[in-house]
Swiss-Prot record:
The lineage of its organism: Bacteria, Pseudomonadati, Pseudomonadota, Gammaproteobacteria, Pseudomonadales. Part of the 50S ribosomal subunit. Forms a bridge to the 30S subunit in the 70S ribosome. SUPFAM superfamilies: Nucleic acid-binding proteins, Translation proteins SH3-like domain. One of the primary rRNA binding proteins. Required for association of the 30S and 50S subunits to form the 70S ribosome, for tRNA binding and peptide bond formation. It has been suggested to have peptidyltransferase activity; this is somewhat controversial. Makes several contacts with the 16S rRNA in the 70S ribosome. This is Large ribosomal subunit protein uL2. It holds the Pfam family Ribosomal_L2_C. Coiled coil: none annotated. GO terms for cellular component: large ribosomal subunit. GO terms for molecular function: rRNA binding; structural constituent of ribosome; transferase activity. Keywords: Ribonucleoprotein, Ribosomal protein, RNA-binding, rRNA-binding. Belongs to the universal ribosomal protein uL2 family. The gene is rplB. It comes from Pseudomonas fluorescens (strain ATCC BAA-477 / NRRL B-23932 / Pf-5).
Length: 274
């Protein structure tokens, strides 16, 4: 994987930094694992904007990724290829199981075409294998972690993400997340060893607004540039600072205000994130 800084042959190329991976598959994705992905433009069934800054972008297909890996225990799989996925920052790996079935998984770092992976209690401790947390040694790095047994991976799924298993006590294990949070998870839950691929994703620079539009992201207008009818920060004679602590268009505090409201799982958090 290489970091390529483009030559400033035009204003749009001047700040472009690309992450080039020669191992990525250059052909079409595996068609049986594709699904139609329709665009909403951020609108709901009434045609009203419910998510701002969404719209346009290149047409995409959704790749069906196996986040559970719980119904192929003990069946060896060969990594056929590593692919780009427009729906996520991580790369995906196409597995060919010994029973002939193919599935996509989130590609772990260091896994390449031809490698053998397996899931289940007897799986060896190596990157890409999926086991229950009770069978993973303390100190191991994991990703794709379940919060409920059988529900599928929910934590550490994006590019370069991982967590460290720091303790095991009774029916729970304790994980240290990248945010600094220490959290208890049921030892029955599954996780994949290693960290997620494409950790260089954060080093890239799109270089121009148009590259963001290709990805379906529309511009963000500052509140102080709006009229009072549109935003609490709007209006005023000349340029203003908004005149109050930063709020959303609906008046809720933003820029650092705590938004976590799930008290039900507070007991699982040993230490809050930094």
């Amino acid at each position: 994987m290489a970091i390529v800084k483009c030559k400033p042959t035009s204003p749009g190329r001047r700040f472009v930094v690309k992450v080039v991976n020669q191992e990525l598959h250059k052909g079409a994705p595996h068609a049986p694992l594709l699904e139609k992905k329709s665009k909403s433009g951020g609108r709901n069934n009434n045609g009203r904007i419910t998510t701002r800054h969404v719209g346009g972008g290149h047409k995409q297909h959704y790749r069906l990724v196996d986040f559970r890996r719980n119904d192929k225990d003990g069946i060896a799989a060969t990594v056929e290829r590593i692919e780009y996925d427009p729906n996520r920052t991580a790369h995906i790996a196409l597995l060919l199981y010994a029973d002939g079935e193919r599935r996509y998984i989130i590609a772990p770092k260091g896994v390449s075409a031809g490698d053998q992976l397996i899931a289940g209690a007897l799986a060896p401790i190596k990157p890409g294998n999926a086991l229950q947390l009770r069978n993973i040694p303390v100190g191991s790095t994991v990703h794709g972690i379940e919060l409920k047994p059988g529900k599928g991976a929910q934590i550490a799924r994006s590019a370069g993400a991982s967590a460290q298993l720091v303790a095991r006590e009774g029916v729970y294990v304790t994980l240290r997340l990248r945010s600094g949070e220490m959290r208890k998870v049921l030892a029955e839950c599954r996780a994949t060893l290693g960290e997620v691929s494409n950790s260089e994703h954060s080093l890239r620079s799109l270089g121009k607004a148009g590259a963001k539009r290709w990805r379906g992201v529309r511009p963000t207008v500052r509140g102080v540039a709006m009229n009072p009818v549109d935003h609490p920060h709007g209006g005023g004679e000349g340029r203003t600072s908004g005149g109050r602590h930063p709020v959303s268009p609906w008046g809720f505090p933003t820029k650092g205000a705590k938004t976590r409201g799930n008290k039900r799982t507070d007991k699982m958090i040993v230490r809050r994130r930094k």
